[in-house]
Amino acid sequence: MLYSSNAILLTVICYELPLSERIRMLLRLEDLFDKIDFFSARDTSFEHHAVLVALFEILDVTSRSDLKSDLLQELDKQRTMLEGLRSNPEVSEKALDHILQDIRAAFRGLLDIPGRIGGHLRDDEWLMSVKQRMSIPGAACEFDLPAYHYWLNLAPEIRREDLKDWITPFTPIRSGINIVLNMLRNSGKNCCYTAVQGLFQQAGSEHQAHLLRLHISSEFPCVPEISANKYALNIRFVPWRSDHKTEVYEEDIPFELTFCSL
């Protein structure tokens, strides 16, 4: 964290730009699982409702992809790569064994998933009736879903046990996602740049990355608009609230950029 001279707390904000649909989906799922962690640890019916909303979104995201096989393939690829580092004297044998153990555990967990991801939820007619009704804006009131209203009025401990039963089968998927994203984020080298008058451009083959991570201080009231391909990277910083799409935040802005690849 950074502190300004007038004692106003400033933070460093990280923006992540996935450069493939596969990584974009993993980041979305990671965000949904984080929301589930946050809300499921609390007691109110509103927070437990938020858990179900996130669970239903996970179902929708995973229904349009072959996530299980993609994760298995990536974990096997990373395991093979890491096994090849055993003869490297600069690599900690203990740390290597630890990550390989995590990869093997996640791999086995994914193999053990029966059928489609989230099948235990899809087979629950009551949950699916709640999900269907929730697809209508504002349609989760007690007169829309009286049985769901009853569940929301049970003791928090009872609701939390139900939530645990619904969340736990996703553990192998989440473990695989965490491993892949952690390895991806740790694969890059941080470089410091300055966007002159809010604009930055760079050409080169290093932009063949899977993920870009940009860090900027919150003292600058702007956000980055990033476009990247294998030929060039363009970053334009715009005011965080603006009525003009072409407006640029015209100051020199220091930022940190990381190109991450698997």
Curated annotation (Swiss-Prot):
Descriptive protein name: Cell division protein ZapD
GO terms of biological process kind: division septum assembly; FtsZ-dependent cytokinesis
Chief place where the protein resides: cytoplasm
GO cellular component, one term: cytoplasm
PANTHER family linked: CELL DIVISION PROTEIN ZAPD (PTHR39455:SF1)
Keyword Iron-sulfur: no
Gene, per the UniProt record: zapD
Protein's organism: Nitrosomonas europaea (strain ATCC 19718 / CIP 103999 / KCTC 2705 / NBRC 14298)
HAMAP family reported for this sequence: ZapD
Keywords assigned by UniProt, alphabetized: Cell cycle, Cell division, Cytoplasm, Septation
